Structure formats: structure tokens, C-alpha cells
Amino acid sequence: MSPITDALVPMVVEQTSRGERSYDIYSRLLKERVIFLTGQVEDHMANLVVAQLLFLESENPDKDIFLYINSPGGSVTAGMSIYDTMQFIKPNVSTVCMGQACSMGAFLLAGGAKGKRYCLPNSRVMIHQPLGGFQGQASDIQIHAKEILTIKHRLNSLLAKHTGQPLEVVEGDTDRDNFMSADQAVEYGLVDSVLTQRD
């Protein structure tokens, strides 16, 4: 975070037997097993999310983790490091879309534990194929084009697995930007239900 946004992060003060203890709000929520994935998915942010997932697993491998997502998407490799960690660790990772989950954000949303993937009522979800750009020698461009097609197939296969949609349907639906409401995301299988209020 930048110094400006650091100054805007609220602090929570708690009374303990040893006196007062202050936390920034995100650290306090981490104690409740809540992780925020907000903004562009990039390497630094992905490393922080992965570290939090691993930490919470070490604290209690049998208790669910809640991953709140508000992201326009970003780097495929950074996102895949989060996804692979979500699948690897023992606790179930419940995903919640607030605001938007687009591109890699939508992929991570769908990658949550089955039956524990949610959207808030006014959130938006968008799936599409991976973006890529490369310049250089023709042979290098050809190598990168082949790699992006491999990544596209891998992402579509995993999306088909998590949504229950046939691969051919996912391939067609991700060909262009495909926006969905919370209810449409449930219908498609990206999430399991829309949360309107706590039980």
C-alpha cells in the first residue's frame, strides 16, 4: 500500500488481559479468517494472499477461510499462484464477490470450495479469454502465441470443471467479454448462491 492509503486504513483497538492492542482493520479481520483480494491481480498482491492462506492453514487446518474478491482481474500467473494455493491447502476457501470479479477475479471466485462460493446482490462477474501482447522476432511471437493458447485451454478446462458447464460452452462464452449479474453467475455455476444478508 502507498503511504496515502496506509493513512486511510482504520485501526481497531481491543482490550486484552495485557492491556490495549491495536490492529489495522485487515489484520483484525485476518484473525477472523477473512482475506481481501482487491484491485489488480499482480505478483506482489498474489504473494500476500498466498502467505495469508498458508498462515491461516497453519493456524487451523480444519476451519474455513473467507476470501472476499473485488477485482478487475490481472496477471494469469499471479492469479494461478493464488488458485493453486486455494486448491492445495486443507481448509475450504469460501469465496465472496463484492463489487466485481472480472477475468482472473472471476476465475478465483469460481475456484472456491463447492457450495461455499457467493456473490453479493449487486456485484458483477465477467469472464473472457486471457489477454496477451508480445513484440519481437517472428519466431518468438509464434512461441508466445502458442503459450497463450495453451493457457487459454487450461483456464477454460478449469472453469468448465468448477462451473459444470461443457468445455465447448465455456470456450464460446469466454471468446469475448461476458458480463453477468449475481443471479446469472449462479445460473452459470460460477457461484453457488447470492447472499442478501447474514443468517
From Swiss-Prot:
Gene Ontology molecular functions: ATP-dependent peptidase activity; ATPase binding; serine-type endopeptidase activity
Biological-process GO terms, alphabetical: protein quality control for misfolded or incompletely synthesized proteins
Entry annotation: catalytic residues: S103, H128
Top enzyme class: hydrolase
NCBIfam families documented for this protein: clpP, PRK00277.1, PRK12553.1
Primary location group: cytoplasm
Compartments in which it is found: Cytoplasm
Catalytic activities: Hydrolysis of proteins to small peptides in the presence of ATP and magnesium. alpha-casein is the usual test substrate. In the absence of ATP, only oligopeptides shorter than five residues are hydrolyzed (such as succinyl-Leu-Tyr-|-NHMec, and Leu-Tyr-Leu-|-Tyr-Trp, in which cleavage of the -Tyr-|-Leu- and -Tyr-|-Trp bonds also occurs)
Name this polypeptide is given: ATP-dependent Clp protease proteolytic subunit
Alphabetical list of Pfam families matching this protein: CLP_protease
UniProt cross-references to InterPro entries, sorted A to Z: ClpP, ClpP/crotonase-like_dom_sf, ClpP/TepA, ClpP_His_AS, ClpP_Ser_AS
Keywords, sorted A to Z: Cytoplasm, Hydrolase, Protease, Serine protease
Function: Cleaves peptides in various proteins in a process that requires ATP hydrolysis. Has a chymotrypsin-like activity. Plays a major role in the degradation of misfolded proteins.
Record note on quaternary structure: Fourteen ClpP subunits assemble into 2 heptameric rings which stack back to back to give a disk-like structure with a central cavity, resembling the structure of eukaryotic proteasomes.
Entry's Gene Ontology cellular component terms: cytoplasm; endopeptidase Clp complex
Record EC number: 3.4.21.92
Family to which the UniProt record says this protein belongs: Belongs to the peptidase S14 family.
